[in-house]
Swiss-Prot record:
Residues in coiled coil: none
Key word Hydrolase present: yes
Family note: Belongs to the TRAFAC class translation factor GTPase superfamily. Classic translation factor GTPase family. EF-Tu/EF-1A subfamily.
Region G1, annotated ranges: 19-26
Subunit structure comment from the entry: Monomer.
Segments for region (G4): 136-139
PANTHER family: ELONGATION FACTOR TU, MITOCHONDRIAL, ELONGATION FACTOR TU-RELATED
Keywords recorded for this protein, A-Z: Cytoplasm, Elongation factor, GTP-binding, Hydrolase, Magnesium, Metal-binding, Nucleotide-binding, Protein biosynthesis
Region (G5), start-end ranges: 174-176
SUPFAM superfamilies xrefs: EF-Tu/eEF-1alpha/eIF2-gamma C-terminal domain (SSF50465), P-loop containing nucleoside triphosphate hydrolases (SSF52540), Translation proteins (SSF50447)
Name of the featured protein: Elongation factor Tu
């Protein structure tokens, strides 16, 4: 059977379910696919099809996630659901499933719980742009005032973590009822209402190609008579022949001009996000550029040494450390294409970090790296991944 062609006639948005264990994230995911399948906009997935998540690796870390896809009238969605809390933490920190928005699932019977709080905080730290709330299990609450209290509590919690708590759409319903085909307002109509909220409230993502140019340097060659060629995969934006660019990171920033671009040995006028290409640089010597630097549009990205991060430290079973580490820990931080040694300062009150912990940490690198908030990195010891992190704040 030939594969179906993916037709790109609607904007594509990456989305996911977040929230406390047993509040109904996976049931909701199943309910969305089943409800939309009725109008041919998704393939219905049963709860247990979603719950047994395949494992995947991101930055050397094994994460269990399930990906489902569905469409509304306006958009095509790729939706990720994780079985366990640790998988969510790892997923959000490694950026394995980049989310343009998320559906926060809260059980109306329980209200916000510790992981509700933690997922909201994580969403804020890793830069999930928008959240929509689904208050699940409303059929288990008889008292209308109680529902209003839970909604208030959720909105306050969102505001506390700097999301617009007063404006975020809150949809009330029962994922289980919808999954069973219930047509009362808490069943399928609630799911349709939720999808409408996602369509209107989660902003359309800016495509990588529309952002400012950035390409990590993977390799450097000198071609006699032509100059120096830098190869890598364009991370975002577009680079054209004749563009002025900066080489940022590790050493003082240099300016140069692109005199040629090639891909698969063919000359191009421009390279764009996703392309693996070679960029010829005017007057640049091979020894002026190295792996770990980036080519960027001038003035857009600065090199930094000190930053704050949110990180997940692997367990022994995941191939991580067997022992805790303490303040002053000095691993390597792998940014884009290279390792840079750095010193960790733990948050006041944290004595030590155990394998399996999620931590807030301040890092000072021995060399500056082109860095922005939300940049992901791996923590390594002699080439072995022992953790993953995301930059939450640049200190200097």
């Amino acid at each position: 059977m030939s594969k179906e062609k993916f037709t790109r006639n609607k904007p594509h948005v990456n989305i996911g379910t977040i929230g406390h264990v047993d509040h109904g994230k996976t049931t909701l995911t199943a309910a969305i696919t089943t409800t939309l399948a009725a109008s041919g906009k998704a393939q219905a997935m049963a709860y247990d099809q979603i719950d047994k998540s395949p494992e995947e690796k991101a930055r050397g870390i094994t994460i269990s996630t399930t990906h489902v896809e569905y469409e509304t009238d306006n958009r095509h969605y790729a939706h990720v659901d994780c079985p366990g809390h640790a998988d969510y933490v790892k997923n959000m920190i490694t950026g394995a499933a980049q989310m343009d928005g998320a559906i926060l699932v809260v059980s109306s019977a329980d209200g916000p719980m510790p992981q509700t709080r933690e997922h909201i905080l994580l969403a804020r730290q890793v830069g999930v742009p928008a959240l929509v709330v689904f208050m699940n299990k409303v059929d288990m609450v008889d008292d209308k005032e109680l529902l209003e209290l839970v909604e208030l509590e959720v909105r306050e919690l969102l505001s506390k973590y700097e999301f617009p708590g007063d404006d975020i759409p809150v949809v009330k319903g029962s994922a289980l009822k919808a999954l069973e085909g219930d047509t009362s307002e808490i069943g399928r109509p609630a799911i349709m209402k939720l999808m409408e909220a996602c369509d209107t409230y989660i902003p359309a993502p800016v495509r990588a190609v529309d952002k400012t140019f950035l390409m990590p340097v993977e390799d450097v060659f000198s071609i006699s008579g032509r100059g120096t060629v830098v190869t890598g995969r364009v991370e975002r934006g577009i680079v054209k022949v004749g563009d002025e660019i900066e080489i940022v990171g590790i050493r003082p920033t240099q300016k140069t001009t692109v005199t040629g671009i090639e891909m698969f040995r063919k000359l191009l006028d421009e390279g764009q996000a996703g392309d693996n290409c070679g960029v010829l640089l005017r007057g640049t010597k091979k020894e002026d550029v190295e792996r770990g630097q980036v080519l960027v549009k001038p003035g857009t990205v600065k090199p930094h040494k000190k930053f704050k991060a949110e990180a997940y430290i692997l367990t022994k079973e995941e191939g991580g450390r067997h022992t805790p580490f303490f303040n002053g820990y000095r691993p390597q931080f792998y940014f884009r294409t290279t390792d840079v040694t750095g010193v960790c300062t733990l948050k006041a009150g944290t004595e030590m970090v155990m394998p399996g912990d999620k931590i807030e940490v301040s890092v000072e690198l021995i060399a500056p790296i082109a860095m922005e908030k939300e940049l992901r990195f791996a923590i390594r010891e002699g080439g072995r991944t022992v953790g993953a992190g995301v930059v939450t704040e640049i200190l200097e």
